[in-house]
Amino acid sequence: MTEPRFELTDDLFTPKEVSWLAFNERLLQEAEDLSVPLIDRLKFLGIYSSNLDEFFRVRVATLRRLAGLGFRSREFIRHDPKQVLDQVMREAKRQHARYNALYEQLIVELGEHGIHMIDELAYDEQQASFVEAYFHKIVRHRLHPIMIRGRGDLPPLVDQAIYLAVRLSDSRGKRKPRYALMGIPTDVLNRFVVLPSRNEEHDLTYLDDVIRYNLGSVFSLFPHDTHDAYMVKFAKDAELDLDDDIQESYFSRISRSIKRRGFGSPVRFLYDGSMPDDMLDLLLTKLKIPRDESLTPGARYHHRSDLMNFPTVGKGSLASPERPAVAHPDLPTDGNYLRAVRRPDVLLHFPYHSFDHVLTLLREAALDPKVRSIQICLYRLARNSSVVNALINALRNGKQVTVIM
């Protein structure tokens, strides 16, 4: 008896992009888990958002490129890239709705524990004075508004940055509205500002709302008396383009491709869904963004990856306690790691062991005259990476440094 033939057809396989979205949705399940401390649940939302940003910049960007190849795309992917792209956008939209509902639920739960996220309309007199002082001392000099004029295009926006699109209007209707775009400096300031609070309550506000409250000061040169602001976020194609120039080294091609990353085509434009249509049309025209599936209407606040840095306020039980990392007993406390690692293998288990061990090893290697080269594989880097600083120092000391990302 012959065994039945089993044919592997494309419909038996789930596209990896769709599978990845299901993987990332596990973070939403963690955020819904009542056994997880409340502030940790918020941080899971931040991790979800950060992962999704990178997914759109790389995987969705690649799908768009493949969709533009037509039938030739089947050389690189089993499924029709247009169909996969449609499936991805539908699933992302479904998860986006789940995410927003979960965020609102967690904000309510924070309130039940005496932690309140308030906007610029809810500041009391003491908080308003604090916000004004904080704005002028800390925030004002970091703002660089760009006026949107009738002629000319806007300069390229910074990838993954968040902006306030501002409309200046005259309540008496005597002057035409004016428009501006202004970046929110979350690269140097915490997105969350802790306000003066009473009793055992804790009031926090978004940095965005601190800026909204002070828009009259920012645009004091203009006679308009009404200021409306809507958040937008821009994600660009971050896939690497490698030229086929065999006369050039792979390193040179990678370097040039990374430099071009900031000028990629838009793959996602997230905007406040309450923005007036005429204002949205103006932005799309000036930024040369088509009205297609890359447009994503959202809520008042974007860039929720900042939730990973939500302040630990309130009772200690609302966040997991920090566990101090311990030193490895087989590594010396006075340095000379290069000699130590020549002995039996040392297993470091993070985050339980201190990452300082790795930094110490790299810093020693950067200085040791016997070290000629350093090769290292890195998966993810901090914004201000001590690892990168150590590797740069090694380069300055004449070492050859190779990093695989």
Show where each model-derived region lies.
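N-terminal localization/anchoring segments of enzymes in phospholipid and broader phosphate metabolism
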Residues: 1-405
